[in-house]
Regions:
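Bacterial Sec-dependent N-terminal signal peptides
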Residues: 1-34, 691
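N-terminal, intrinsically disordered low-complexity tails/presequences enriched in Lys/Ser/Pro
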Residues: 29-68, 131-146
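Extended, structured, electrostatic nucleic-acid-contact surfaces
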Residues: 61-82, 98, 104-110, 125-126
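Small-residue hinge/turn detector
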Residues: 85-89, 115-116
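Transmembrane beta-strand segments of Gram-negative outer membrane beta-barrel proteins
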Residues: 139-176, 194, 198-204, 240, ...
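Exposed, low-structure sequence patches enriched in small/polar residues
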Residues: 181-185, 286-288, 342-375, 382-691
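Outer-membrane beta-barrel proteins
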Residues: 207-224, 277-284, 337-340, 411-413, ...
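Outer membrane beta-barrel
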Residues: 218-312, 426-448, 596-612
Length: 691
């Protein structure tokens, strides 16, 4: 213990020294913005736990790798960039309409309301190209001749052994068949993609998670296979999707299997529906399988979609659905028995009519399972969806003008439950914007594919008012602030009575020099929680208080060397139990020589938390299409290094090594995931071939 304490003290001293050394830097190089920084600032602790944000990350990564041509860009494409406000999108399109094609990205500073940070972020996702004829029908021979293809493969190698990979006697496995994983410990994925400009896409994704069997009796190939074809903007046809696809209409009350804005991201954009999108990620839930079509008839866009998909579920002895399984793991006989054991058939329509700044839409969805969802015996689930068929419909509406933007949707679910969400964005000036949002989701509202703005993560049993402000206080100082007051009319998990809460955030970004950037975020949340005595008798509700602090310093030492220092601090307070807290201090460095052949990202961090409840989330650089937003608790150290080498215009190699050392335990994890030791070392490899 004495050696560990001494080691911890030394590590803290090292990181504090690095922190102040970074503060003392006074360089003369331009501040570097990356889309990784954008994701980190838009993502909260709650957001990163949802698969939809992994899809969002994949989409951003793909746009970054295949940027839009600014001279042919559409409003729908601009809306996929989460840092653009509705008014700025209109201003970009208006500039193109009045001034014609852009000659260089330097013209962005001439667009009305275009601030410095947005000018730095946009070149990560756009380029200046030739103006093309819109909605032209491409010839098949041109598609095949000029289309671009890509093969991307990834291999994760854990340099340790979990309990699920140990050898056990046959007698033990006969009694406990789920004690051992059926496959090896490697995780492997393979992606093939083709695209012809922004009009034609197709691809195939194959994935095998750690522990899953492959190329054997249990799985003849990979555990997960996905294929898609997407065609956009051909004549009157807006979009045609075949295979796996995702949908997002309105504010997400009826249909949204794409990502939903968190409270921080709401300050940057409005998050209107994006329509039909291909599903090319390795996420094994949140997508449809079938056909979707969007067609333009006058000023109305008509979208039709049909899906017949197999889903994972937990079934009882009567083969009724008790819950859906969304983690995609099929490592043991028990997990494999839940694979694709329920079929879900879905059909729907969406209409969107536009006129003079107004958009009026209507969505109707019907879906049916081959078995029924069982009524839960848990009191807080008394109003949850039951049965095997569901019908949901809603109306969404948008009004855009120079001074204000109004977005909303109102929906009705099976059984008459209602939901509504409405937001008003006031553009007070070029520097100040206010946002007011009201939502009311009844306790008996059922929409199985809804994903909208909420506190509890579901579109049910919630009412709240959100007030936010986005302020450019000066040329170098930006501030974002919000307060969200919410209540639940019915019970929630571990909340045995109607409850209420409040969520407050203040976020500041300061760039005093072109080489220095400072970022600070404070978040306070109060939510009611059950109080019980030593005999587990319910005594009532009491507030649990959470404080979250994050500070970040960015510094460019040279055109090729970039430093980032992060400090996270969490504190939880509940009744007289005192408080538990945790912090994470890290230093990251990025090196990219002028030749652009190689790039190195490395980081080191020390974490110390009192409990799992005070765990700290942190984002670190990783491989392409790898969403790396992980949590740490206890006491330990995290090291990682990522190397990217662009061997040529065709080949790219990436490798990442991650090392986690715990000072407060001799084992990591539990059950099949248990590691005998205090170390976790992982190796990640990736190869990309473009042709």
């Amino acid at each position: 213990m004495g050696k560990n304490s001494q080691r911890s003290a030394e590590l803290r001293s090292i990181f504090i020294f690095l922190f102040f050394v970074t503060f003392s830097i006074n360089a003369v190089y331009s501040q570097t913005y990356t889309w990784d920084d954008l994701v980190m600032k838009l993502t909260s602790e709650e957001d990163c736990e949802y698969d939809s944000w992994k899809n969002f990350y994949d989409d951003l990564c793909e746009i970054h790798d295949n940027p839009y041509n600014i001279n042919t860009i559409t409003k729908d494409q601009l809306e996929t960039l989460p840092f653009l406000t509705p008014q700025l999108i209109e201003n970009i399109l208006y500039y193109q309409y009045t001034h014609g094609p852009m000659k260089s990205l330097g013209e962005l500073q001439l667009v009305e309301d275009m601030d410095y940070e947005t000018r730095q972020l946009l070149p990560l996702f756009i380029y200046v190209g030739e103006q093309e004829k819109k909605n032209a029908i491409p010839k098949l021979k041109n598609i095949l001749k000029y289309g671009k293809q890509e093969i991307l493969t990834r291999l994760d190698v854990p340099l340790y052994r979990k309990a699920g990979y140990m050898e056990y006697p046959d007698s033990v496995l006969a009694k406990y068949p789920n004690r051992k994983y059926m496959g090896n410990s490697l995780h492997h994925s393979l992606r093939y993609s083709f695209h012809y400009g922004t009009k034609v896409f197709w691809g195939l994704t194959a994935d095998k998670d750690s522990g899953e069997p492959a190329f054997g009796k249990a799985n003849s190939t990979y555990d997960y296979l996905s294929a898609y074809v997407l065609i956009k903007n051909i004549g009157r046809m807006n979009t045609l999707a075949l295979g796996n696809y995702r949908l997002h209409y309105g504010q997400g009350l009826v249909m949204n299997t794409d990502f939903s804005l968190g409270k921080t991201a709401m300050l940057s954009t409005a998050g209107t529906g994006k329509g039909i999108k291909k599903h090319s990620s390795t996420s094994e839930s949140g997508y449809f399988k079938g056909i979707a079509l969007s067609y333009k008839v006058g000023k109305t866009d008509v979208s039709l979609f049909y899906s017949y998909n197999d889903r994972d579920a937990n079934l009882d002895d009567s083969l009724l659905i008790t819950s859906f399984k969304t983690d995609g793991n099929h490592r043991t006989p028990l997990e494999l028995s839940k694979k694709h054991n329920v079929t879900d058939e879905l059909a729907g329509i969406h209409l969107d009519y536009s006129f003079k700044g107004f958009h009026l839409g209507a969505t109707a969805v019907y879906n049916r399972f081959n078995t029924s969802i069982k009524k839960s015996s848990q009191p807080y689930k008394a109003y949850d969806a039951i049965g095997n068929s569901f019908c949901t419909s809603g109306i969404d509406y948008v009004y855009n003008s120079h001074l204000l933007n109004f977005y909303g949707e109102t929906a009705i679910g099976q059984g008459g439950g209602m939901a509504t969400v409405n937001s008003l964005h006031l553009n007070i000036s070029e520097r100040y914007k206010l946002i007011l949002l009201y939502r009311n989701y009844s306790k008996d509202y059922h929409a199985l594919f809804a994903n909208a703005f909420s506190e509890g993560g579901s579109v049910q049993n919630e009412e709240g008012i959100y007030l936010g402000a986005d302020m450019k206080l000066s040329r170098t100082l930006n501030a974002k602030i919000y307060v969200d007051c919410f209540r639940s009319p019915w019970l929630r998990y571990q909340v045995s009575a109607p409850s209420k809460g409040i969520d407050f955030l203040s976020q500041f970004s300061w760039v005093p020099l072109k080489s220095i950037g400072l970022f600070f975020k404070y978040r306070f949340k109060s939510k009611e929680k059950d109080v019980k005595d030593e005999n587990n008798n319910w005594l009532g509700l009491a507030n649990k208080y959470q404080h979250r602090l994050q500070g970040q310093l960015n510094a460019n030492l040279s055109p090729s060397l970039f430093l980032q220092t992060d400090l996270y601090y969490n504190q939880n307070i509940f009744l007289n139990a005192g408080h538990d807290s945790g912090y994470f201090l890290s230093q990251q460095v990025s090196w990219k020589p002028i030749s652009n052949i190689c790039k190195v990202d490395a980081g080191a961090g020390y974490f110390h938390t009192d409990s799992y409840d005070s765990r700290v989330y942190t984002y670190e650089k990783s491989l392409l299409y790898a969403f790396s937003f992980t949590s740490f608790y206890g006491e330990g150290m995290r090291l990682y290094c990522t190397v990217r080498v662009d061997c040529s215009d065709h080949f790219m190699l990436m490798a990442k090594y991650g090392h986690t050392k715990y000072f407060d335990r001799s084992t990591i994890g539990s059950s099949n995931e248990k590691i005998n030791g205090s170390l976790k070392n992982d190796l990640y490899l990736q190869l990309r071939y473009k042709f």
